[in-house]
Every structure is written in C-alpha cells, then in structure tokens.
Amino acid sequence: GAIGHRIVQGAEFFTKSEIVTDAIIDKIEEIAPLAPVHNLAHVQGLRSAKKVFGADVPNVVVFDTTFHQTMPPKAYMYGVPYEMYEKYAIRRYGAHGTSHRYVSMAAAKFLGKDPAELKMVTCHLGNGSSITAVAASAWTPAWA
C-alpha cells in the first residue's frame, strides 16, 4: 500500500506525480507562498505521514496544477510586467486539475470516445469552483 496526497499547488516544478522525498517536501514548502493555506498544511501532513507510517509505506503526491501544464503562455501569462512572472511566479496555474482530469476521462468513457477526439468544458463545483476547456485530454484555452 501507499499513502496518496492531493497537493493544490505544484507551480512549474512538478509536472507529474512523485514519490515523496525530503527534497519534494522542501520544494512544496518553498512554493507555499503561491498557496499558503494549502501547501503549508500539505507539508505538515506529509511530514506527519512519514513519521507515523515510516519508510516502509511510500507517500505519493499528486498535484492539482499538473493537469494544467499544457496551458500555453498566451493563456497563463497575465498583463503585468514580465519581471513579475520571473521574480514572483505570477501567472495562471489552473485549479482543481485532478477533478478536471477525472471528469474529462469519465465523460470520454461514458460517450465511448477516445479522449483525444473530444473537446469539452468541465466544471468543478465544491468549496472552490472552476471551469476548464479541455481538448485532447489536456487543458486548452477556449479561444484556441
């Protein structure tokens, strides 16, 4: 068995799920200013899980932002000076990616279609809400 952790913010550093190491935890903590309430709680949870369950039980992190990694620069850049992006990582990252990925794949299965053939809009409604245009099982801006 393993312990799975959904991490809200992976910034541009995490493009896939990862087996947790101390370096991974440190990086999640480093990027916490992008999602301070969530990522700092994730760090506490990761450290606690490692302490309680030990090295015999692997911990895996899944990032909500991974699904949105295919977003092109024209979609994720804001109309602010580029230096703000470089210095403070100010950009659009996308939200609720694990939910949007699941819903888009489930919709394709329900329709009996290859996800690569579909264009759809998925909605995540919960404590937070988001809408994402999906094409070929990846994020695409509605205007593309």
Each PLM stretch: what is its role?
Residues 33, 51-55, 105-113:
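Generic secondary-structure signature for well-ordered alpha-helical cores
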Residues 27-45, 88-91, 97-101:
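A gly/proline- and charged-residue-enriched helix-loop-helix capping module
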Residues 40-59:
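Conserved nucleotide-sugar donor-interacting segment of glycosyltransferase catalytic cores
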Residues 69-144:
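Glycine-rich phosphate-binding loop of actin/hexokinase-like ATP-binding domains
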Residues 53-56, 61, 120, 130:
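Non-transmembrane, aqueous-exposed alpha-helical and coiled segments at domain scale
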Residues 18, 23, 40, 81-83, ...:
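Alpha-helix boundary/interfacial micro-motifs
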Residues 1-38, 58-60, 66-75:
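Short beta-strand-loop/turn "lid" adjacent to the catalytic site in phosphate-handling enzymes
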